[in-house]
Amino acid sequence: TSLHQQLKALYAGDEGEQEVKLGRYRIDAVRDDLLIEEQHGGLSALRDKVRSLRRRHDVLIVKPIVARRRLIKLDREGGAEVSRRWSPKRGAATDLFDELVHFTRAFPHKRVAIESPLVEVEELRYPGHGKRRRWRENDFVVEDQRLVRVVKTVELRSRDELGSLVAGD
């Protein structure tokens, strides 16, 4: 999605590189000596990769959380805008805990940090079924997600910072 590409460019910066091959892995971005892996899905998918990379490198995991989403309905794929509205669902920094439960073998670790940008996105969707098995009335396919802005960024490097997140500091 555009969101993935935009965040990758943001974290790589002007001096960094994107899509770097390192051994058997492809790294989303490398800035100085820092390896940056962006993950929209579950963190457990990165667990073994991070455990391997952290032996020789510092690793930053970027796990975006959608704080706010504007839904833009199109009449068809690549078509004209029909309507737009805000989704009632909102994400929060504490949503990260659901993912960390499956990531304990990789984090916390002195060479691993997690950054979770809370982002506002525009999601373009059109009528259709996509690859889902179940049909529903008013089904839609997500065409793209675009970054509007980063609202806030939460950084975790240690167990203590996890505690601060729970306490709301």
Specify the residue positions occupied by each region the protein language model found:
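Long, low-complexity, charged/polar intrinsically disordered regions in eukaryotic proteins
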Residues: 81-160
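Short, charged, amphipathic alpha-helix that recurs within catalytic cores of restriction-modification
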Residues: 42-58, 89-104
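Acidic-basic catalytic patches of nuclease active cores, encompassing PD-(D/E)XK
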Residues: 1-26, 102
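Short aromatic-enriched loop/helix-cap "lid" or pocket-rim segments at secondary-structure transitions
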Residues: 72-75
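Short beta-alpha junction loops
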Residues: 64-69
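C-terminal, charge/polar-rich interaction regions
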Residues: 157-169
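Conserved catalytic cores of phosphodiester-cleaving nucleases, focusing on short active-site segments
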Residues: 27-42, 46, 53
